[in-house]
Amino acid sequence: MALLSILRYPDPRLHKTAKPVAVVDDRIRQLVRDMADTMYDAPGVGLAATQVDVHERVVVIDVSEEGNDLRVLINPEITWKSDERQTYEEGCLSVPGIYDEVERAARIRCKALDQQGQPYEFEADGLLAVCVQHEIDHLDGKVFVEYLSNLKQNRIKTKLKKAEREAERA
């Protein structure tokens, strides 16, 4: 089990756009295992490779309460979004301790590759739809707090810098 270091907002590397995975090989499968271990250890319900400073289009998600329904999305692409919207309070492993409401599509359809490189499609609603959209945003260089007002973004940056200074003193 290898735990990866998670980048913290506002690290500029979180704004890099991830490149598509050309070949799903053992290196990618190891990345998936390490990302899953990191996500479960954090604990979180989703993690994009961008968050661990790997700029390839790889996402792991598990929104189950038991933590036993790992979904691997390689080169994920949302192919349809409902016009209906939903608002969820989101958090992020790259923005620790910060939660705020974000409005997103209520239902989506997504296509991706699994860890064997096989294509698949699925539809999602509720927390899974939110999580897929959130993690794909990471791959596109966007962090959830960027949906918030400038005032809220500045408050979050101040709060995170203060927490970082306190952690350094400890």
Curated annotation (Swiss-Prot):
Transmembrane segments: none
Keyword flag Signal: no
Source organism, top-level taxon: Bacteria
BP GO terms, sorted: co-translational protein modification; translation
Keywords of this entry: Hydrolase, Iron, Metal-binding, Protein biosynthesis
Keyword hit for Iron: yes
Cofactor(s) it depends on: Fe(2+)
Pfam families (alphabetical): Pep_deformylase
EC number: 3.5.1.88
Reactions listed under catalytic activity: N-terminal N-formyl-L-methionyl-[peptide] + H2O = N-terminal L-methionyl-[peptide] + formate
Residues of the active site: 135
Top-level enzyme category: hydrolase
Binding site for Fe cation: 92, 134, 138
Free-text comment on the cofactor: Binds 1 Fe(2+) ion.
GO molecular function: metal ion binding; peptide deformylase activity
UniProt record similarity statement: Belongs to the polypeptide deformylase family.
Cross-referenced HAMAP family: Pep_deformylase
Reported function: Removes the formyl group from the N-terminal Met of newly synthesized proteins. Requires at least a dipeptide for an efficient rate of reaction. N-terminal L-methionine is a prerequisite for activity but the enzyme has broad specificity at other positions.
Protein name: Peptide deformylase 2
Organism: Bordetella pertussis (strain Tohama I / ATCC BAA-589 / NCTC 13251)
Gene name in the database record: def2
